[in-house]
Swiss-Prot record:
Function: G-protein coupled receptor for PEN, a neuropeptide produced from the precursor protein, proSAAS (encoded by PCSK1N). Acts through a G(i)- and G(q)-alpha-alpha-mediated pathway in response to PEN. Plays a role in food intake and body weight regulation. May contribute to the regulation of anxiety-related behaviors.
Organism: Mus musculus
GO MF annotation, one: neuropeptide Y receptor activity
GO biological process terms held by the UniProt record: feeding behavior; G protein-coupled receptor signaling pathway; neuropeptide signaling pathway; phospholipase C-activating G protein-coupled receptor signaling pathway; response to glucocorticoid
Protein name as it appears in the record: G-protein coupled receptor 83
Subcellular location: Cell membrane
Signal peptide range: 1-17
Transmembrane recorded as keyword: yes
Keyword tags: Cell membrane, Disulfide bond, G-protein coupled receptor, Glycoprotein, Membrane, Receptor, Signal, Transducer, Transmembrane, Transmembrane helix
Tissue distribution of the protein: Predominantly expressed in the brain, with moderate expression in the hypothalamus. Expressed in the thymus.
Phenotype of the disrupted gene, per the record: Deficient mice have normal body weight and glucose tolerance when fed a regular chow diet, but are protected from obesity and glucose intolerance when challenged with a high-fat diet. Knockdown of GPR83 has minimal impact on anxiety-like behaviors in female mice and a decrease in anxiety-related behaviors in male mice. In contrast, a local GPR83 knockdown in the basolateral amygdala leads to more anxiety-related behaviors in female mice.
Family per similarity comment: Belongs to the G-protein coupled receptor 1 family.
Membrane topology according to the record: Multi-pass membrane protein
Length: 423
């Protein structure tokens, strides 16, 4: 049954809001309905008596979020996500900046993707974990706004950057004779991406308040909750709906169309052109592997963020009520998308594998000094080559391209530019 207005006054007396100012985590709640200065009567009447009873009995923010099993699982999951995300995305930036031949617009976009993942890993994920463990927000007003902004801004930057990568790959493969996006233009596009992401993220970050609730003399909790301007219900609903459509569904639609056309070109086109069959097939394998890698990145991003986006959208539409365990599980699943990309790059890109091996070798015990080793009867490669050629380089066995240029399965993020136009 719905809560009578008279009973609302009694319930309000048992939960006293002692302070108001600041951000929201991602799940609005009954506290916002109780204390929000602009909470509408429709929103208040949307809960049953059982809902309000559970809230006053502190089940909503107490026992539900303190389930030991759920807490332990999410602590481990969040911790692994933070460690792997930071290590992997820093490695991505290191590899691209270190390799001169990887300096291209596509590589800049991939670095931008890694930077967005690092931002959300540092400014949102740890704070959300602590909020879940303590059932209260302990970082103050400033970080409440910053954490909320980081989550939305990183999501928007990632979606827009993946769209830019898809458009760039479409341009390179569908129109190989046209000039590619230069590094300067790539920097400009990245700047535009961040401006757009900031613009769409600020409403979520600004419309937040830090509410402090006194349940008893010993139990006081602070919560980051949304506090949208009037009409609050409609503002919240349409803001989340616009965000979901413009910065999640629309980018994924553009990406899908771009990669579908690229796949049709690569998998169905059989024109060889003025190159050998071996060179042509090697080039196609390289481009196919690159496209597969980028498509896999997009698919994982879409799958990881879909549950949380749907949850927030349904919540703002009042189709469901809040659920702590469900929200934090969806939030972790979305945050886990930040640590998958580096593993995909290392799996499908030789440059990343080489750099990872080099970093791991630095952590191993250094070899023994040269004088402690027994002399080898076999001369080194350099000595043997010099003695054999007498200072002259041996001729190549044939006139084909070096095998390193025609190996299959090696992906170069910046070398998808075809040698020949394919019809």
């Amino acid at each position: 049954m719905k809560v009578p207005p008279v009973l609302l006054l009694f319930l309000l007396s048992s939960v006293r809001a002692t302070e108001q100012p600041q951000v929201v985590t991602e799940h609005p709640s009954m506290e916002a309905a109780l204390t929000g200065p602009n909470a509408s009567s429709h929103f208040w009447a949307n809960y049953t008596f059982s809902d309000w009873q559970n809230f006053v009995g502190r089940r909503r923010y107490g026992a539900e979020s303190q389930n030991p099993t759920v807490k332990a699982l999410l602590i481990v999951a969040y911790s692994f996500t933070i460690v792997f995300s930071l290590f992997g995305n820093v490695l991505v930036c290191h590899v691209i900046f270190k390799n001169q031949r990887m300096h291209s617009a596509t590589s800049l976009f991939i670095v931008n993707l890694a930077v967005a993942d690092i931002m959300i890993t540092l400014l949102n994920t740890p704070f959300t974990l602590v909020r879940f463990v303590n059932s209260t927000w302990v970082f103050g007003k400033g970080m409440c706004h910053v954490s909320r902004f980081a989550q939305y801004c990183s999501l928007h930057v990632s979606a827009l950057t993946l769209t830019a990568i898809a458009v760039d790959r479409h341009q390179v493969i569908m129109h190989p004779l046209k000039p590619r996006i230069s590094i300067t233009k790539g920097v400009i596009y990245i700047a535009v991406i961040w401006v757009m992401a900031t613009f769409f993220s600020l409403p979520h970050a600004i419309c937040q308040k830090l509410f402090t609730f006194k349940y008893s003399e010993d139990i006081v909790r602070s919560l980051c909750l949304p506090d949208f301007p009037e009409p609050a219900d409609l503002f919240w609903k349409y803001l989340d709906l616009a965000t979901f459509i413009l910065l999640y569904l629309l980018p994924l639609f553009i990406i899908s169309v771009a990669y579908a056309r690229v796949a049709k070109k690569l998998w169905l086109c059989n024109t060889i052109g003025d190159v050998t069959t071996e060179q042509y097939l090697a080039l196609r394998r390289k481009k196919k592997t690159t496209v597969k890698m980028l498509v896999l990145v997009v698919v994982l991003f879409a799958l990881c963020w879909f549950p949380l986006n749907c949850y927030v959208l349904l919540l703002s539409s009042k189709a469901i009520h809040t659920n702590n365990a469900l929200y934090f599980a969806f939030h972790w699943f979305a945050m886990s998308s930040t640590c998958y990309n580096p593993f995909i790059y290392c799996w499908l890109n030789e440059n990343f594998r080489v750099e990872l091996k080099a970093l791991l070798s630095m952590c191993q015990r250094p070899p023994k000094p040269q004088e402690d080793r027994l002399p080898s009867p076999v001369p080194s490669f350099r000595v043997a080559w010099t003695e054999k050629s007498h200072g002259r380089r041996a001729p190549l066995p044939n006139h084909h391209l070096p095998s390193s240029q025609i190996q299959s399965g090696k992906t170069d993020l910046s070398s998808v530019e075809p040698v020949v136009a394919m019809s």
